[in-house]
A protein has these predicted regions:
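Conserved active-site and SAM-binding loop architecture
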Residues: 1-135
Length: 135
């Protein structure tokens, strides 16, 4: 079976990465802004720790060396924040800046041009997703 080269952004503690790493696929990059999540991911995947970084995805896209975008990537995956789209959210946070982070996921995807994209999110983002897919 061919090994998949994958990137996981908004990776959290690595729930999505876990299955792919268990199948010995190649984690090329994992990014999250939360240092505790990154520490957990590095603990679970010490052999990939150099590819796991604690950084704001917006800064990564704007400031990172272009070598990240040179790798041949089969799969880009991630779970952009969902608080503003979740039906469990009882607060009115429609203007929460995290609601726009899916746009940076898409911008990252355009830069690396993966064969496949996997976005994990809540049902409430579906209306936004329809707008995204028409672009």
């Amino acid at each position: 079976m061919k090994k998949i080269n994958f990137i996981d952004i908004f990776c959290g503690a690595g729930g999505l990465s876990f299955s792919f790493k268990k199948r010995n696929h190649n984690l090329k990059l994992a990014v999250d802004i939360d240092p505790i999540s990154i520490k957990t991911l590095k603990t679970n995947f010490p052999q990939s720790s150099k590819n796991i970084i604690n950084e704001d995805i917006i800064k990564l896209i704007k400031q990172r060396k272009s070598d990240i975008f040179k790798n041949k990537i089969d799969l880009l995956m991630g779970g952009p924040p969902c608080q503003g789209f979740s039906t469990a959210n009882r607060q009115n946070i429609l203007n929460d800046p995290r609601n726009e982070l899916y746009n940076y996921f898409l911008e990252f995807a355009k830069k690396i041009n993966p064969k496949f994209i996997l976005i994990e999110n809540v049902v409430g983002i579906k209306t936004r997703a329809n707008d995204i897919l028409t672009k």
